[in-house]
Amino acid sequence: MQIQDSTQIQDPIEVAAAVKDMNVIFVQDVSGSMMDERRSVANGINEIVGDVKKRYKAPCEHKATVCIIQFSSHDCIRVGTAMPVHDVPVMRETDLVCDGMTALWDAVAIAIERMNSNSAGVPATTYIFTDGDNNDSRKYTQSSVNEMIADNKKRNPMHSILFIGSDPSAKRNAEGMGLDRMHSIQHGSDNTPVAYEVCRRALGRCVSGDTQSTEFNHDDIVMSETPYHEPHTPCAPHTPLPHHTDSQMSDDDYAFASDDVPSIVHRTS
């Protein structure tokens, strides 16, 4: 499956240039249950990073960095290197190895520590994406993460932490971490692309100066929580094929319906 390179597409719609520096951290759940969401996750992150690249392109004098943390079980938390946004490569499905359990609190704590150490005095946004509840953290608890977030708010008011979950426990977990309604959304399992889209919009409003920090607004919440339906394409009226005996069948009559389906393009890493 070919991943759309959202960081390379020439978008005819101009976006407002950034008016501040920004460090972005993605905390992405890659537990076993995320396997079927790899395409949506890769495309969603590419869309957000691509939008940031546009906002920070020359002649913009401000800078942005991106760090991606992938987590599953407590011993499978992979912390990527923070790099300038223009150096961030396109994410592919194969970059997301989904397996294991969900060490949510351990991963969030690591992200907060990284944000505090690398973004002192610099605006920062941390996105936490998960489809489940914590079931494998060993070092941190929800209570300790709550304390870390509260301390971060006092020391770094320019930092934003947003929780995006599709599990029924999402709202409860967000509240348990001390995150209010403007910093958390609970979306349906079929709404993953929309969830990343509202995150892109929220970050865009912040870096362009429309809002002081990255946060969701009412429209974002409604959009993410409204059930998503694939656009329906009307089918052409069915025309019965003429009856032939085997001796009358032509090669075209043996064409498979799958011939009308675009071929799958495989990309190598």
Label every PLM stretch briefly:
Residues M1-S269:
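Acidic, low-complexity intrinsically disordered regions
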